[in-house]
């Protein structure tokens, strides 16, 4: 019997990431090649026309798995019955804008979207926040959705994870598929910590394979953490195709499971693991089993790692306090 279409809502659908994402979703790369999808594009009123143009192109691709495209400027309609929500649209930081202003502007987007998801989404809804500051935007959305299990709200650190894989593979002259068990900890920001202490390269310790703490400290970690800024500098625009690719990877693994013997990185509400305060949306090593993320337990955290994880967690705590002071969460 044919599967019923899965409702996938993409916010900021007319933007660059949305454009890089929608065609891949419609082709079956998000959920699998046997799962039809119905796309819902959510945009602000002034971008509806652009979204209509994208919908026309989606039609023109004649994707067999695409059951339809709907366009909305009302979150309540866009999230009604949604199974997968990709929250891409966010208020970007502009010149001279204070971080507090950025958090407040995004609170005005992600609070109402969280409430709309709470009221209308399907029982199995999964939410991925891509729009920055992603961790705290996910925290705000989740705080407005008290009826949905907290771990259904995630923020994307898969792009950082993929960037770290690529840098490590280049250093060791191996394929990215030869590397397992790499981790991004903390915030999707310059304080994030890409951790190779548990990673393996063809079954061997990655740290032993690299054998160069100076490279790890002074090249690898800052290159991964500041890669987004380097791309803006080179391209004149932020990462779009690579961000869309990471979103596809994140949801695909969430729905279909992570490969045996490996894990990935996801920011999700902490359960207190590894000393990260409960409820804080922080990146962890995770596996996906039966459609749910589980934090990998029992990893030894050395002093080098502890210091860096704690620094990123402190930043997340500061962001949480800032949005609490603004009345965006309780």
UniProtKB/Swiss-Prot annotation:
The active site is at 188 (proton acceptor). It is an enzyme of class 1 (oxidoreductase). It comes from Thermobifida fusca (strain YX). Its EC number is 1.1.1.37. Catalyzes the reversible oxidation of malate to oxaloacetate. GO terms for biological process: malate metabolic process; tricarboxylic acid cycle. It comes from the Bacteria. NAD(+) binds at residues 12-18, 106, 113, 130-132. The gene is mdh. Keywords: NAD, Oxidoreductase, Tricarboxylic acid cycle. Belongs to the LDH/MDH superfamily. MDH type 2 family. Gene3D superfamilies: Lactate dehydrogenase/glycoside hydrolase, family 4, C-terminal, NAD(P)-binding Rossmann-like Domain. InterPro entries: L-lactate/malate_DH (IPR001557), Lactate/malate_DH_C (IPR022383), Lactate/malate_DH_N (IPR001236), Lactate_DH/Glyco_Ohase_4_C (IPR015955), Malate_DH_AS (IPR001252), Malate_DH_type2 (IPR010945), NAD(P)-bd_dom_sf (IPR036291). The keyword NAD applies. This is Malate dehydrogenase. SUPFAM superfamilies: LDH C-terminal domain-like (SSF56327), NAD(P)-binding Rossmann-fold domains (SSF51735). HAMAP family: Malate_dehydrog_2 (MF_01517). The keyword Protein biosynthesis does not apply. Pfam families: Ldh_1_C, Ldh_1_N. GO terms for molecular function: L-malate dehydrogenase (NAD+) activity.
């Amino acid at each position: 019997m044919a599967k019923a279409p899965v409702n996938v809502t993409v916010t900021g659908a007319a933007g660059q990431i949305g454009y890089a994402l929608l065609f891949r979703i419609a082709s079956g790369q998000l959920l699998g090649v046997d799962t039809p999808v119905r796309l819902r594009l959510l945009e602000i009123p002034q971008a509806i026309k652009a979204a209509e143009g994208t919908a026309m192109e989606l039609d023109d691709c004649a994707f067999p798995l695409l059951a339809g495209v709907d366009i909305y400027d009302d979150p309540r309609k866009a999230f009604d019955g949604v199974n997968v929500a990709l929250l891409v649209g966010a208020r970007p930081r502009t010149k001279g804008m204070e971080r507090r202003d950025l958090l407040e502007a995004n609170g005005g987007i992600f609070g109402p979207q969280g409430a709309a998801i709470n009221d209308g989404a399907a029982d199995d809804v999964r939410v991925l926040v891509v729009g920055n500051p992603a961790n705290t935007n996910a925290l705000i959305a989740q705080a407005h959705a008290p009826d949905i299990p907290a771990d259904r709200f995630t923020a994307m650190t898969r792009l950082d994870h993929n960037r770290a894989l690529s840098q490590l593979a280049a250093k060791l002259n191996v394929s990215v598929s030869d590397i397992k068990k790499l981790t991004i900890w903390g915030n999707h920001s310059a304080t994030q910590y890409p951790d190779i202490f548990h990673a393996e390269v063809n079954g061997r310790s990655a740290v032993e394979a690299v054998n160069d703490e100076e490279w790890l400290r002074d090249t690898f970690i800052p290159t991964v953490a500041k890669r987004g800024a380097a791309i803006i500098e080179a391209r004149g625009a932020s990462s779009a195709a690579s961000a869309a690719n990471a979103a596809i990877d994140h949801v695909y693994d969430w729905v279909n499971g992570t490969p045996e013997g490996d894990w990935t990185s996801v920011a999700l509400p902490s359960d207190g693991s590894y000393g990260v305060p409960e409820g804080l949306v922080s990146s962890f090593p995770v596996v996906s089993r039966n459609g749910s993320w589980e934090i990998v337990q029992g990893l030894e955290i050395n002093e080098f790692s502890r210091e860096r994880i704690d620094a990123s967690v402190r930043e997340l705590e500061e962001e949480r306090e800032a949005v609490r002071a603004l009345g965006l969460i309780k």
